[in-house]
Amino acid sequence: MEETRKKGSGTTDLTVGRPLTRILQFALPLVLGTLFQQLYSFVDTIIVGRCIGTDALGAVGTTYSLNFMIVGFVLATCNGFGIPVAESFGAKDRDDLHKYLFNGAVLCVVMSLVFAVGTTLVAAPLLQLIHTPAELLENAVHYIRIIFLGIPATVLYNYSSTVLRSLGDSKHPFYFLLVSSFLNIALDVLFIVPLGMGVEGAAIATVISQLVSGILCTWWFFTKVEDIHFTRENCVLSGRHSKRLAYIGFPMGFEYSVSAIGAVIMQDAINQLGSVAVAAQTAGEKIRQMFTLPMESVGMAIATYVGQNHGAGRTDRVRQGIRDGCIIQAGYSAIAWVAVFLVKRWAVGLVLGDAEPAIFNGAVEYLTVISVLFVLLGFLMIFRYTLQGLGYSVQAVISGVGELIGRALGGWLAVHQLGYLGICISNPLAWGFALCYCVFMVTRVLKKESRAA
C-alpha cells in the first residue's frame, strides 16, 4: 500500500485513498481549529460586552466589515499562495515546491508591511465613510488601528499554516491555534478586567495570540517537515513562480475584498438603523459565525484536496470530492440549524447580559432567519474552494461580485423597505448569488479538463 503520511512531519498525500474519508480526516482538525478560534472570538465578545459595555461591543462590531475587506484580502491571498504549493506537492515536483515556498514568503513580507502602514493611516476616514455612529467612533478607531498594525502577525500565521495544510498537515496548525486561543482568552481577561485597557486590550490580545501561533507554525515547518531543504539554488527570486503565485493569490484576495465591499455597504445600512441595530446584528453575527465557520474549514480542506489531485491529473477524484463535500455540508447544515434553534436565546443572553429587550430580540431574529439558509453557505464553500483549488482564481473573483450584489441588495432593502429584516437576509442573498455562479463555473471547468484529458 502506498505511504500517504510522512512519519513525524504530519504531511499527507490526498491523491490516494477514499475521497470522503480523506476529506473528513483532513477537515476535522480544520473544523476543530475554527471552532476554537470562534470560541475565543465569542469569549472576547462576552468580555467586551459585559465588562466594557454594549457601546464597546457595537464599536468592535462596526469594524467587522473593514476587517473583512482588508484583513480578509490578506488572508485569502495567503490561502491562494498555498494552491501552487499543493499542486507541486501532489505532482512530486520538489524544485517547484521549494521555489513556490520561498517566493510566497517574500510576497507575504512585502504585502504585510504595505497593508499595515497604509490601512492604519486611513482607518478613521474609512469608519467615518460608512457612517459609524458618533458614540462608537472613538473606540472603533482605536480597535481597528491595532488590528491593522498587527497585519504582519496575521500574515505570519496564515501563510505558515496554509503551507502546512498544502502539504497535507492540518493537525499541527490546529494544535498551535488551540494554544493561541487559550492565550487570547487569558490576555483578554488580563488586559480588559484588571488592567482596564478597554477595546485596545482586546485588539492587542488578538495580535499577540496570532503572532505566537505563527511562530509555532514556522518553527514546526523548519524543524519537523521532511523533504524540505532550502539551498542557494532553490531559495531564489523567480519571476515565473512569483507570477504564478500572484495570479492565484491576489485574485483570491480581490474576490474576498469585492465580497467584503458588499459587507461594508451592509454595515453602512446597519449603522443608519442606529446603535440598537448595530449591537443586535453584532451579537447575532458572532453567534452565527460560531456555527458556520466550520463550513469554511471543510471548504479549505476541499481546496487542498483539489489542488493535490489536480496537480496529479486526477479529475475523477476531484469530481468525487465535490460530491462527498456537498454531502458533508448538507448534513452539517441540518445539525447546525437545529442547534441554533435550541440555544439561540441562551447564546444571545450569554453575549449581551442584561441588554435592553430591543437588542436581545434583534439578535434572536437575526439567528432565526439566517440559520434556515446555512446550506447555501455550505455548498458555496465547496464550489468556490474547488474553483480556487483548480487554479481558476481570476474567475472566482466574479463570485465575490455576486456576494457584493446580495449584500448591497440586503442593505438597500433594510434602509428603504424591510428595515432590520433586510439585514437578516443580506448574507443568505449573497451566498445564493455567488453559489449560482460557482456551480456554473466548476461544471464548465471540469467538462473542459475532461475533454483535454
What annotation goes with each model-predicted range?
Residues 25-44, 146, 157, 180, ...:
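Transmembrane helical elements of multi-pass membrane transporters/channels
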Residues 48-68, 134-139, 199-200, 241-248, ...:
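Interfacial/gating helices of multi-pass transporter permease domains
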Residues 69-72, 116, 184-188, 214-218, ...:
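Hydrophobic transmembrane alpha-helices of multi-pass small-molecule transporters
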Residues 57-117, 154-173, 267, 280-344, ...:
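Small-residue-rich hydrophobic transmembrane alpha-helices
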Residues 78, 146-165, 173-181, 202-217, ...:
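Short runs within selected transmembrane alpha-helices of multi-pass transporters and secretion channels
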Residues 1-27, 85-150, 194-250, 306-373, ...:
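Short alpha-helical transmembrane segments in multi-pass integral membrane proteins
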Residues 35, 39-57, 127-134, 190-197, ...:
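Helix-terminus/linker motif at the lipid-water interface of multi-pass membrane proteins
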Residues 16, 20-39, 43, 66, ...:
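Residue-level signal for short hydrophobic patches within transmembrane helices
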